[in-house]
C-alpha cells in the first residue's frame, strides 16, 4: 500500500524514488513485522491465556517438559499477522507472485489453525487426522503451484546445484515434485518445533538465505552472471521474505528459552509451506535440502525411527524422535541443543549461498 501511494509521487518528489527499490522495502518490511510482533505479543499472550489456548504435553516428554504445560500456543497467529500486514504495506500488490506466496502462507496456516483448535478443544495433543492434514496441504499447495505453472514466465525446468547448464525439464512431473517440496518442508518445520526457539531460529536463517536467492532470480543481470534461472517479477517476493524474517525475530523475543509463547501448527505449517513455495518460485528447490538441513535431519530421524521400529519388532535407533528429543534424553540441556541447531542452520545456509559460485 505504501508502494502504491508513494511511488506515483516520486515524479514530483525525487526522494521518494527510494520506495521503488526492493531492497529498501524489504528492510522496512522486516522492521515493520518485527515491531508489530513485539508490540502485539503481550496482548496476544493475554488473549490466548484468557481463552485457554494452552499447550498440552505428550506423555513421552512429560517429565522433561511438564513445566511447559499451559504455555500459550497458536502464537503463529501473531507471526502470521505481522508477516501479512507488513507485506501488504511494503510490497507491490500488482505482482502475482506476492499474492501466491501470501496464499500459501495463509492456506497452510489455516490447516495448522484447524489442527491446533482441535487439540485445544479436545484437551489433548492429537489434532486432526494425518490424512485430513495432508489433504489440506495438498489442496493449498496444488492450487498455488497450478496457478504458478500457468504463468507465462515460469518454467518447469529444474536447477541442479553445482551444475551450470544442467536444467532438466520435468514437464508434468514438476507438479508432484513441487508439492513434495512444499509439504515436506511444512512437515519438517512442524517436526522441529519441539523445543523453545528451535524451529524459529532455522526458519529465520532459511528465509534470509532464500531472500538472496529470490532477489537474484528476479534480477536478470545477477541471474545471468551467476548462472541461475531468471524468473521475471519474482524478486518482489524478497519483501515477503523480509517480513517473515522480521516477524520471526519478533516471535523469537517471546519464544526464546524459557518460552512464553509457542507457535503451534498454525505457525510451523505456514512457515514450512511458504519456505518450500519460495524455493519453488526461485527454482532452487533442491537447495532446500541444504538450506533447511536442520528440518531435513529432524524428518529423517523420525522416518528412520518409525521404519526401524517396525522391521525390528520394537527396537529403536534413537532414544526418542525427532532428533532433538534424543539429545534431551541423553541429558543435553535444552538451550544448548537449540543453540547448536542454530549454528548448524547458519553454516548450512552459508554453504547453500556458496553454491552460487561453485558451478
From Swiss-Prot:
Membrane-spanning parts: 27-47, 73-93, 94-114, 134-154, 166-186, 197-217, 233-253, 261-281, 286-306, 336-356
Pathway(s) the chain acts in: Cell wall biogenesis; peptidoglycan biosynthesis
Cofactor: Mg(2+)
InterPro entries noted in UniProt: Glycosyl_transferase_4, PNAcMuramoyl-5peptid_Trfase, PNAcMuramoyl-5peptid_Trfase_CS
Transcription regulation among keywords: no
Coiled-coil regions, chain positions: none
Substrates-to-products reaction catalysed: UDP-N-acetyl-alpha-D-muramoyl-L-alanyl-gamma-D-glutamyl-meso-2,6-diaminopimeloyl-D-alanyl-D-alanine + di-trans,octa-cis-undecaprenyl phosphate = di-trans,octa-cis-undecaprenyl diphospho-N-acetyl-alpha-D-muramoyl-L-alanyl-D-glutamyl-meso-2,6-diaminopimeloyl-D-alanyl-D-alanine + UMP
One GO CC annotation: plasma membrane
Similarity remark: Belongs to the glycosyltransferase 4 family. MraY subfamily.
Protein name listed in UniProt: Phospho-N-acetylmuramoyl-pentapeptide-transferase
Organism expressing this protein natively: Maridesulfovibrio salexigens (strain ATCC 14822 / DSM 2638 / NCIMB 8403 / VKM B-1763) (Desulfovibrio salexigens)
Lineage of origin: Bacteria, Pseudomonadati, Thermodesulfobacteriota, Desulfovibrionia, Desulfovibrionales
This protein's encoding gene: mraY
Amino acid at each position: 500500500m505504501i508502494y502504491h501511494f508513494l511511488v506515483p509521487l516520486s515524479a514530483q518528489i525525487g526522494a521518494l524514488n527510494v520506495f521503488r527499490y526492493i531492497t529498501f522495502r524489504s528492510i522496512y518490511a522486516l522492521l515493520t513485522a518485527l515491531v508489530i510482533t513485539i508490540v502485539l505479543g503481550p496482548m496476544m499472550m493475554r488473549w490466548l491465556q484468557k481463552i485457554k489456548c494452552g499447550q498440552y504435553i505428550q506423555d513421552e516428554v512429560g517429565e522433561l517438559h511438564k513445566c511447559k504445560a499451559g504455555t500459550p500456543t497458536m502464537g503463529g497467529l501473531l507471526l502470521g499477522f505481522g508477516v501479512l500486514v507488513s507485506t501488504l504495506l511494503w510490497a507491490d500488490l500488482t505482482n502475482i507472485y506476492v499474492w501466491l506466496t501470501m496464499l500459501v502462507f495463509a492456506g497452510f496456516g489455516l490447516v495448522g489453525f484447524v489442527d491446533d483448535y482441535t487439540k485445544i478443544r479436545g484437551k489433548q495433543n492429537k489434532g486432526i487426522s494425518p490424512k485430513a492434514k495432508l489433504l489440506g496441504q495438498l489442496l493449498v499447495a496444488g492450487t498455488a503451484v497450478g496457478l504458478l505453472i500457468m504463468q507465462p514466465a515460469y518454467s518447469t525446468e529444474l536447477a541442479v546445484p553445482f551444475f551450470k547448464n544442467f536444467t532438466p525439464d520435468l514437464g508434468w512431473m514438476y507438479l508432484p515434485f513441487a508439492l513434495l517440496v512444499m509439504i515436506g518442508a511444512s512437515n519438517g518445520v512442524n517436526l522441529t518445533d519441539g523445543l523453545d526457539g528451535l524451529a524459529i531460529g532455522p526458519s529465520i536463517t532459511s528465509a534470509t538465505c532464500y531472500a538472496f536467492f529470490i532477489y537474484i532470480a528476479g534480477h536478470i543481470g545477477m541471474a545471468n552472471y551467476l548462472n541461475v534461472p531468471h524468473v521475471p517479477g519474482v524478486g518482489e517476493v524478497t519483501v515477503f521474505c523480509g517480513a517473515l524474517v522480521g516477524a520471526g525475530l519478533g516471535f523469537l523475543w517471546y519464544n526464546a528459552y524459557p518460552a512464553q509463547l509457542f507457535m503451534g501448527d498454525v505457525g510451523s505449517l505456514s512457515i514450512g509451506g511458504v519456505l518450500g513455495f519460495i524455493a519453488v518460485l526461485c527454482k532452487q528447490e533442491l537447495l532446500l535440502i541444504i538450506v533447511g538441513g536442520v528440518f531435513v535431519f529432524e524428518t529423517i530421524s523420525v522416518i528412520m525411527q518409525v521404519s526401524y521400529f517396525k522391521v525390528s519388532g520394537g527396537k529403536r535407533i534413537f532414544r526418542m524422535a525427532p532428533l532433538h528429543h534424543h539429545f534431551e534424553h541423553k541429558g543435553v540441556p535444552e538451550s544448548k541443543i537449540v543453540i547448536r541447531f542454530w549454528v548448524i542452520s547458519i553454516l548450512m545456509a552459508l554453504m547453500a549461498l556458496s553454491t552460487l559460485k561453485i558451478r
